[in-house]
Amino acid sequence: MSNKKNKNQKNNKLNIIKIIIGSLCIILLVMTIILVSKPELLYRVQGSFLGRNDNHISFKENKYSEINLQGFDLNSQTEWRSEQSLILLNKAHALPEGFVPQMAEYKDSGVQMNVAILDAYAQLSAAVTENTGDKMYVSSVYRSVEEQAELQANDPELALPPGNSEHHTGLAVDVYVFEHAGMNFLESEAGQYVNKNCYDFGFIIRYPKDKEDITGISFEPWHLRYVGLPHSKIIQQKFITFEEYINLLQPNKFYHYDKYLITRQPLNSNIKLPTGLQNIVYSPDNTGHVIVTGQIID
């Protein structure tokens, strides 16, 4: 009687184990189907769990007393590099009056890009080919106000109004690989590489997943925006949008990330910086401020 009872208990345990294993297999199968059918979710899983934050670098505010700050006239700093890389354009921030993009031709291709992104895009494109074997192509970079007006007239729900598109700056790049454009870009190895690693080259996914309430644009894994280093890596590390990053940089405060010092100050003011900086770059942000970035001398 006791042996029969023990045997029944053993069978019950085996049945429970089989049910648990079967349930786990079903869950795994469902998750696999979902990830395969929705590559943007696969991108998010990869971005969260496959090494994007393995080398976490702190981003923190640095406080300086006035006695340790030196004033600079922005217009007379010939050794500083002026860029347009951090200009914010969206539905609420239109192209500044009198804005002229700093454009140049990319590698005798006939494609016009903002000069700030030429080297970075070349490096990203080469890395895509080296790591995936695919060649990355550009479908759109610079777009005039007139071209944007025509585009919006044809598709008013998707296209931003003329004057509000990042393509006016030459800093936004729509990319694709053979047989994989638009949302299908993420189905390619190249698309997944770009969405995971573009931040290392100064680019961001300008309209990330689940941030439409902030950007006003649904997820576009093919739309890259150049903001430069270290800004792209901070944005990636914090999983925030460009809008959120601009708001993160409080005016007249100083932030330290790796070997960089970053400050956002009123555009028409005497820029105050601590000593011991080199390779200083500044860019207006289209909110009445300028973002200054410098490398800290060891």
List each language-model region with its residue ranges:
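Extracytoplasmic cell-surface/polysaccharide-interacting catalytic and binding patches
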Residues: 2-5, 10-141, 145-298
